[in-house]
Amino acid sequence: KNMITGAAQMDGAILVVSAADGPMPQTREHILLSKQVGVPHIVVFLNKEDQVDDLELVELVELEVRELLSNYDFPGDDIPILTGSALQALDAINNEPTLKKGDNKWVDKIYSLMESVDSYIPTPIRDVDKPFLMAIEDVFSITGRGTVATGKIDRGIVKVGETVDLVGLGDTKSTTVTGVEMFQKTLDEGVAGDNVGILLRGLQKGDIERGMVLSKPGTITPHNTFESELYILTK
């Protein structure tokens, strides 16, 4: 459930597979779900390389992953696959926080991974000119400030002081945006693609549920009937 919620907002993803163990059952599920919710680009990181003595085993895991990706209509032959050890890199940084690129091979492998992400996953084109819309992923209260709805802005721009509609369960409610925050920074506005927390005036936490949306007033109509395509996962 949590993976689907996060993946549905992604412009790209890093698929982490153990180089020591190879693809696991959940690897297949993650690839399937990524495809079905529309994750457009994937980069693969074969982790725990430090636990593998035979490089041929790493190459075998890479072939397995490429075949698995191709089976779900991802370009398995073209997707970048990087190797490394997240734990070794983390330990190196913790032991010597001033490490620079070129000082440690495990840290360098993480740099290489992020360079592949930057080069392979294109910068998405955002719908900033369309009316504001954000699906609510979570909601919580801040003592002394009010109620905050979090999520990724799908389109448009929202500014502090603007009126927005809360659409979904029950009657549509209007409220005023009193704050926009992203990664603990206060903003004047949020734009399409931003993962933000929006502080709302006059609403209680119980008024908002995950799955409701915030929108520019009058631009969204809720529906009781719709057609869908379902993918059922067994335990």
UniProtKB/Swiss-Prot annotation:
User: What's the catalysed reaction?
Assistant: GTP + H2O = GDP + phosphate + H(+)
Q: Which residues form the tr-type G domain?
A: 1-125
User: Per UniProt, which keywords does this protein have?
Assistant: Chloroplast, Elongation factor, GTP-binding, Hydrolase, Nucleotide-binding, Plastid, Protein biosynthesis
One function term, GO molecular function aspect: GTP binding
Q: Which GO terms describe its cellular component?
A: chloroplast; cytosol
Alphabetized InterPro entries for the sequence: EF-Tu_GTPase, EFTu-like_2, EFTU_2, P-loop_NTPase, T_Tr_GTP-bd_dom, Transl_B-barrel_sf
Q: Where does GTP bind?
A: 47-50
Which EC number(s) does the record attach to this protein? 3.6.5.3
Cellular location of this protein?
Answer: Plastid, Chloroplast
What this chain does, per the record? GTP hydrolase that promotes the GTP-dependent binding of aminoacyl-tRNA to the A-site of ribosomes during protein biosynthesis.
Q: Which family does it belong to?
A: Belongs to the TRAFAC class translation factor GTPase superfamily. Classic translation factor GTPase family. EF-Tu/EF-1A subfamily.
Q: What is this protein called?
A: Elongation factor Tu, chloroplastic
Taxonomy of the source species: Eukaryota, Sar, Stramenopiles, Ochrophyta, PX clade
